[in-house]
Amino acid sequence: MATTLAERLTHERDFHDRLEREPLSYQMVRIASEIFYNKDDDGVLWGPVWKALDLRGKVVLDYGCGSGGFSVRLAARGARVYGNDISEYLVSQARAASARRNLGAEFYVGDAHHTPFPPAMFDYVFGNGILHHLELDRAYREVARVLKPGGKAFFMEPLIGHPLVEAVRWATPGRRTVDEKPMDFAAIESSRAAGLVPACRTHYLTAVAALAGAAFGRSFGKASVRTLDALDQKLFRMAPSLKKKAWLSVIEYSKT
């Protein structure tokens, strides 16, 4: 585990550079992304966000943009997109993805705790599984710094507490960086110290079983996720304490 921020950043950069270049890992991530992390209008995680937002003409940041897949989606919705990532290789992929589509998105290599953007630049900040890799207090301050007054940030993040997911994490330590830590509700609430007000949606209690549905094809797997997540939402309403056993969250942070 890192003892300094510089060590942490090195761990993160080296891990994600290596992961992206491993064909098997890429296939595993792609299957999981299509089934569980569906970012389209019909996805249970991001679908409600797209219904609530009109991104046309908005200036947005893809925080921890990776290879740019989510950035492309944001640009397709009419946003002026900027992205940052610690990995030079992934940023090169993101730039290529934008160039192929003539999107005009801009990408920068660097530390997410200290981005190159001026204060109050962005209407919205988006991130997918990035916060739990960072020093949260610094990350929250940076997100608040670059957001316009009244701006919002949306992050999809893993939670700690799902028994099956925790077992998988324990059994496969090499699939994660040594410094990452899934979020808990205290970590989410700690954003208030940076002037951000959080609102959290929890997902995937029973829906983790949808991975088995992938054996019948991705379409069946995605349909299984929607069905099981609908059940999960009913369970969360009936017994709110079950939210502590959810696998994933989508967190909306509003700048005060």
Predicted regions and their residues:
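Conserved class I S-adenosyl-L-methionine
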Residues: 1-55, 154-176
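A short acidic, Gly/Pro-enriched loop at the edge of an enzyme's catalytic core
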Residues: 113-124
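A short glycine-rich, Lys/Arg-flanked "PGG" loop and its adjoining helix->strand segment in the class I
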Residues: 138-149
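Class I SAM-dependent methyltransferase SAM/SAH-binding core
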Residues: 61, 67-114
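A C-terminal cap/extension of S-adenosyl-L-methionine-dependent methyltransferases
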Residues: 205-256
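A short SAM/SAH-binding and catalytic strip from SAM-dependent methyltransferases
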Residues: 124-137
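Short alpha-helix
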Residues: 180-197
